[in-house]
Regions:
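Long, acidic, intrinsically disordered low-complexity segments
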Residues: 1-6, 93-97
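Short, contiguous alpha-helical
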Residues: 3-8, 19-23, 30, 40-82, ...
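Basic, Lys/Arg-rich DNA-contacting stretches centered on the C-terminal catalytic core
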Residues: 7-11, 85-90
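Short Lys/Arg-rich basic patches
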Residues: 14-18
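A short, ordered amphipathic alpha-helix with a cationic face
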Residues: 28-29, 120
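Residues within well-ordered alpha-helical secondary structure of globular protein domains
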Residues: 35, 58-61, 101
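Surface-exposed helix-capping loop/turn segments at secondary-structure junctions
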Residues: 35-42, 109-119, 154-160
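Acidic/histidine-rich alpha-helical segments that form the ligand environment
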Residues: 86-123, 130-144, 148
Length: 176
């Protein structure tokens, strides 16, 4: 939640909220991974659908391309098609580590940005966007796939799914 008494600028608050969205996503992803086996991570409901493993690889690939290399104007080595290969058998531990490392790098990039830098233009995937747009795009993209991960987890576990957040727990942060 934003601190309404804070002396943060709008740009600082935007950066904080973008990073918080990723933190909330990771709470939910960790909750799902804690309930799933290695095999369930790579399950998909139909051959043409993505597995949770594919969604993690894809979300991290997008976060790196848009939020790290795109913002920094550094060499992009993303292999987008490889993120969707059904035979990509990366372990749960490796997938979570990939998320952790990618988010840590993204956090460093975002925190280093000045207000003026947020309005600088970049070309990412042949789209002309501001850095602010790139951050908004990639964090909401990550959160969207997080909800797909939750749906795939719930589909597999049914009534045995354990929520990461309960409304009666008295938590101060909004769940995504």
């Amino acid at each position: 939640m934003p601190n309404l008494n804070s002396k943060h600028s709008v740009s600082e608050e935007f950066k904080n909220q973008a990073l918080d969205l990723l933190n909330q996503s990771m709470i939910k992803i960790n909750n799902c991974f804690d309930q799933l086996s290695e095999e369930q991570i790579w399950w998909s409901p139909v051959d043409s659908a993505n597995s949770i493993g594919n969604l993690i690889l894809h979300s991290c690939g997008n976060l790196r391309q848009w939020g790290i290399t795109g913002i920094q104007k550094s060499q992009d080595t993303r292999q987008r098609e490889a993120e969707f290969l059904a035979d990509s058998r990366v372990s749960k531990t490796e997938l979570l580590e990939l998320c952790k490392v990618t988010i840590r790098e993204f956090r460093h990039v975002v925190r280093s940005l000045s207000e003026a830098a947020l309005l600088a233009e970049r070309i990412i995937q042949n789209f002309r966007v501001t850095v602010l747009q790139a951050i908004l795009h990639t964090t909401t993209h990550f959160a969207g796939h997080t909800h797909q991960i939750i749906m795939l987890t719930r589909r597999q576990l049914g009534k045995n799914y354990q929520f990461a957040w309960q409304p009666d727990e008295g938590q101060n942060e909004l769940p995504i």
